[in-house]
Amino acid sequence: MAKTLFEKVWEQHLVAEPANEPALLYIDLHLVHEVTSPQAFDGLRMTGRKLRRPDRTVATVDHNVPTIAADRLIIKDEIAARQIDALRRNCAEFGVELFDVQSREQGIVHVIGPELGLTKPGMTIVCGDSHTSTHGAFGALAFGIGTSEVEHVMATQCLPQGRPKTFRISVEGELPEGVTAKDIVLGIIGRIGTDGATGYVIEYAGSAIRSLSMEGRMTVCNMSIEAGARAGMIAPDETTFAYLKDREYSPKGKAWDEAVAAWSELKTDEGATFDRELVIPAIELTPYVTWGTNPGMVIPITDEIPGPETAASEADQRGIERALEYMGLKPGTPMEEVAIDVVFIGSCTNSRIEDLRAAAKVVTGYRVNEKVRAMVVPGSHRVKEQAEREGLDRIFREAGFEWREPGCSMCLGMNPDILTPGERCASTSNRNFEGRQGRGGRTHLVSPMMAAAAAITGHFSDIRTWEFKGEEVLA
């Protein structure tokens, strides 16, 4: 019987599938951070349980760690300091490997998992974070879980899960100039909506997806949850294997050859059926900018801010009216005329070396607009080190960007990097909800190249018409 990629991974991890009850899945890798783990560890302690598989549990600090070097030594925020200290104590007590603030391996959990080779094709991966779907770029079944589920996995290394439906989204053809992986996923969400994939696992396919680097594939899978999906997956191929080869936690020698042989079978069989399918011609995609308060409120850079009359229902009309009020925008305003105050390049969506190279290429030879505050936050220490070896930090600093230490930073208002009320930010992150980057902050989601261009011009700009200076620097 022909099977989809999802079905193969799901069935390989079934412990039990009783009738009329959730299935029980074995979990290969549990990623842990400081925010959603303290109560779970306390639950183990109170019930006298041990951590079932410390060898399949890895922790880091990322969500509320400061990104200014001096502030990382003594963390001023009381809640953040308590959470980080609790993670240190818990990892020491339960035997969990922790990549702490000063560790070379520290970084955003969804950046370090792949770069260390912890993430592998065919795995089941969970984390107490919505954007765990990032790891699906490797052909893993990866999804976020709540704190009670974190404790369940810690205690049993298994998790009850209802079987989701399958949804294949194929992007076919060559991507137009200036269109990136971020634009692919924003374009998808714009088409199907923020609930368009609720109850599904998405498999991304098609020639445009296959042409992406692993960094690009991670960006696409990262935002699957923003379309309502439980997870997003891409079949592993030679691009995947080349990325994983020789990484710290990847198999070596004969074990590598055996792993690649097994991973090569993780693809949807010809004739396998999906519950739903969508084909998008790549030529229809464009650089996008979100204008509202969810990722589905997105338009091409050349469009105008929509008005309530464009809504398909009364509920949607009210949503547009509320979003326009919160965002301080008027219908009919060209997106390219919307001025910004802050630029944030970072997050688990777009903080990898490829993202920083793309942004640096845009800003080379330019200066940040005098009215804009701009920062670049690498996703991990290793990304930061690589960028500094390539001189990207110098390019950003000379242009007027702040060059920060690794962490989740301005993606969410849980650390010192926040917007003030009314500030408007061009952000490479994944969510633009009300208050996401700080109370009253206004978030617009864009690609790294689009964010970099906005930092220079002071407003949203079409990257397709950008005049690049000094491309040879990054050749």
Swiss-Prot record:
Its cofactor is [4Fe-4S] cluster. The keyword 4Fe-4S applies. One of its GO terms (biological process) is L-leucine biosynthetic process. Pathway: Amino-acid biosynthesis; L-leucine biosynthesis; L-leucine from 3-methyl-2-oxobutanoate: step 2/4. Pfam families: Aconitase. Catalyzes the isomerization between 2-isopropylmalate and 3-isopropylmalate, via the formation of 2-isopropylmaleate. This is 3-isopropylmalate dehydratase large subunit. It comes from Acidobacterium capsulatum (strain ATCC 51196 / DSM 11244 / BCRC 80197 / JCM 7670 / NBRC 15755 / NCIMB 13165 / 161). The gene is leuC.
